[in-house]
Amino acid sequence: MSANFDAKGYYQVLEVPPNAPLSLIKQQYYSRAKFWHPDHNDNPDAVEIFQKISVAYNILKDQKKRLKYDLLSLIYNNHDFPDMEALNPYKNQSGKDDAALRVLKQRRVTAFFSGFTKKETKDICNYAEAKDMVVSTSVANWLKGWWSLSAFIENIKALKFNYNAVQAADEDNFKLLIHNAVAYESNNRKDFAWVYAKQALLLVKSNGREKKLLRTFIDILDYH
């Protein structure tokens, strides 16, 4: 989760706080753009900074774009931030739209005569798919993981971990729910966007920025 709620540094480049009113954003845009315009600023980074100022203003001046940026900044950082203009929702294992997806974390064990290896995987699926995948993984673990005592013990741990994972709700799921809420809205599927935003809201424990952003997003979906 982004620590400062500004994954791409748009608020930073305009020198405004994340809760800045539109009037301040406009004021800072004109001031910063004038200062960094490459026609009269000899700084070697002037072109890059001026372009970023323009991109930042284009996002933050629009209520809906700004809200989407703020939500995605909760779950992405600068290095993995997605293209907001080409955001696609995650779908179930059959490649279909699904309003009840979760991230399933599983532990896979493979034994050898000299020991064993284990790795954790993450899959996006619905509840029914998750149960089937856990059973399938458990069978595979038993077939691959019975050759040594240490692997057998690790398999018991993996079995418990995998079955508990079906019901897990954590940061990975919050990321999935936010992503799909924004992606479905961008794809004009407000029904799915609303459901995912509501589910994400249930995972927010405190009355902080996350809850405020999600409630605003849901209100906009309800209004339109």
Feature map (PLM): residue ranges:
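Hydrophobic, aromatic-rich membrane-embedded alpha-helical segments
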Residues: Q106-K122, T137-Y163
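N-terminal J-domain/J-like co-chaperone modules of DnaJ/Hsp40 proteins
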Residues: M1-P44, K52-L60, K64-K68, I75-N78
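Short, tandemly repeated low-complexity microdomains enriched for cysteine and small residues
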Residues: Y69-L72, K212-L214
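Alpha-helical protein-protein interaction scaffolds
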Residues: E171-H224
